[in-house]
Amino acid sequence: MVFKINLPPEGLFARSLVISELLGLNNVGISIDNDVVNIERKEEFKDNLKNELSQFKLVFNKLKTYKKNYANEVNLAEKVFNGDVEEFFKEDKEEYFLPLIFPEIMEAEKWFGGWSGSGKGSKRTIGVNRQSFILSLLSLGKYQLVSYRAAKEQVTVLALVDTTVMSDMCKPSKKKELRVQSNLIAQLSHISRLLIFSTILDEQGCQEVLLLKEGTHRAEIYERNSHTSLRPLIRFWTLVDDDSVERRITSLANQSPDSLNKVSNYIFEGIRGTLSPVEVAYMIARETYLKEEQSPLTSWDVKKIREALERMRVEMEEVYSST
């Protein structure tokens, strides 16, 4: 028997969370038809759900701090996360409200905005069904890349399915955990952050990277990096195809954020084609191991970077020659 889940409306952050969680499950027979998700294998879905609930209690623990104003939500989540999976499948007409950590996106096309205010009367919440509520919690835990402080605000980085390019074939994932010290991420440039984040994404994931900023009375998505913009960086790491290079690039971020910022710019210019692969290799070498003996990067790393850029250039030439 097919189990159906009604998705949150278009334009809500919760919709992207729910879709990401569902597409990331294995062998449950998911298809999406407008605002309805059809799950063909309910028992396999239930087994997947139990496994996810045991791994991602991080966001539920955070949600408990809202219990004063969101008792129904916290009580439901507590039952499900403590093993009562049947609660997830119950049908009811009640809406479960998502507090500030789940901002509504007021401009769906741009994915910017969020509710502000200090009380429920100031419309700081949105309502979804119980299935979407639980799946949103799981997704926030599963696809969180890192969380760090920037000035007085907490920044959470998420890698969710980009619903503008989404299909039922997308398989979002995190290949590994991010190895950069969270207290150093704020020192990295925009390009450096994306280069590092791309090391843990997969080409089949259709994922975008969102930065969620939480203040005292407001949560908002203040930066969105679409899958289309990330695809060249993800492809670059696929062609590098060497975990040791990724580790040493990450070590460079931990040792010298300024140096990584320069290296990232060179790689980005190589991807864009404004620098040749040989020029990129020379400039990275000059900035790292030729300049500083203790630099984590080696001539092997620079060789792998140059070769990946050369292969990207060949791929692009093949694309242009076929059009």
From Swiss-Prot:
Keywords: Antiviral defense. CRISPR (clustered regularly interspaced short palindromic repeat) is an adaptive immune system that provides protection against mobile genetic elements (viruses, transposable elements and conjugative plasmids). CRISPR clusters contain spacers, sequences complementary to antecedent mobile elements, and target invading nucleic acids. CRISPR clusters are transcribed and processed into CRISPR RNA (crRNA). GO terms for biological process: defense response to virus. Sometimes seen associated with the aCascade ribonucleoprotein complex, minimally composed of Csa2 and Cas5a, which binds crRNA. Other probable components of aCascade in strain P1 are Cas6 and Csa5, while SSO1399, Cas5b (SSO1400) and SSO1401 have sometimes been seen weakly associated. The Csa2-Cas5a-crRNA complex also binds target DNA homologous to crRNA, probably forming an R-loop. Purified aCascade forms a filament about 6 nm in width. This is Putative CRISPR-associated protein SSO1401. The aCascade complex was purified from strain P1. The lineage of its organism: Archaea, Thermoproteota, Thermoprotei, Sulfolobales, Sulfolobaceae. It comes from Saccharolobus solfataricus (strain ATCC 35092 / DSM 1617 / JCM 11322 / P2) (Sulfolobus solfataricus).
